[in-house]
């Protein structure tokens, strides 16, 4: 009986050690699961959709035989509305979010493409209709682009500088010639 008591006490001791080891906290594994579910993907989707929608409207305008302002005004107003809606959607995200570098690069590419599309549209409108005819539309386009860039700079710190680097071939003189003065100020380009 004495041997049975010793064996059971040893078994209970081993069992208590196993309970102790199971109760110890374990280190969490290194995973990036939360990084993929952040607001960076939402921002990327907004910018990609913006580029797609603006490109579709610019293509529609390119296929129109421009003779008078009324031919193009509805389509330019639609572009202004698309950019404004995207800018308002961007500002609803958190301020100064941290996103991956590859997502940030994709966002910069989309925004730079939107700026290029709008600048090319402005150049086309001025060439075909004249500055005095489309000046009101140019000012509206300038305001909506300024809103987009300002809201992007609120959400992602330093993104405006990356956009400037990507649109370096569009000089400040071109932006000034198409009357996008507010964009010049936001982008920090000298005349």
Model-derived regions: residue spans:
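A taxonomically broad motif for mature regions of secreted/extracellular
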Residues: 25-191
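Fungal secretory targeting signals
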Residues: 1-38
